Amino acid sequence: MREKSGYMKQQVALVTGSNRGIGFEIVKQLAMKKIDVILTSRNSASGEAAVRKLAKDGVKKVVPMELDISSQVSVDRILEEVEKSFGRLDILVNNAAILIDKDDVTASNADLETVKITLETNLLGAWRMCKAFIPLMKNNSFGRIVNVSSGAGEFEYMATSGGLWPAYSLSKASLNALTVMLASELKGTNVLVNAVCPGWVRTDMGGKNATRSVEDGAATPVWLATLPDGGPTGYNYYDKQQVSW
């Protein structure tokens, strides 16, 4: 059922790579907005532990599901689970990502196997999820897709980085391109697609010296995930402000 405003009476969100870090905080903030949230992790035990941790903090409405976005079989399986349990998906946050570039590697001497592995998760994983769930969103004439990108994927950064983090930077630049293409394709469907740079956040990936908390890093993804009908689409954001690609 749909409210007159166009919002679903009870929204359902899925956040990839969300048993820890920014993804975990995104799940928490969405659930606190009374949204049913699917917390996903590659390991079911890790996901279940994360849900128990949220429950201890009084955060409910969170369901754990196992997901490996680098596997089409796994993506097909979770699509089936979501359709069976909820019948729809309103919000997709593509948060899962890996950073496996070595610090001394540049574009000219990159290990292409590392590039392939990184693209498989950071780009193709998000693409698989979009392909799987966009039909559900279009059927309900409602969807919000948030691609968690990085400043490392922005052209201005790459022009001054000296070729560092080549696999990761390329994967995030490609994710930005996917964001633009999907937003263009889905205009007029009420499925909004945006990218976001969460900044340098204190997580396992960002390290303890990072300047931002997970709460700060999750704020803009959650804002984009809950945009009203007619909201912006096809843009890149940092702290709720549009930034260049």
Regions found by a protein language model. Name each.
Residues 59-60, 81-94, 100, 111:
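A glycine-rich helix->loop->beta "capping" turn
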Residues 98-102, 106-119, 138-187:
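Catalytic loop of short-chain dehydrogenase/reductase
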Residues 2-38:
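Canonical Rossmann dinucleotide-binding motif of NAD(H)/NADP(H)-dependent dehydrogenases/reductases
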Residues 93, 129-133, 137, 178-179, ...:
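Hydrophobic positions on the long internal alpha-helix
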Residues 44, 66-77:
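The beta1-alpha1 cofactor-binding region of Rossmann-like NAD(H)/NADP(H)-dependent oxidoreductases
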Residues 173, 188, 195-196, 207-245:
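C-terminal helical subdomain
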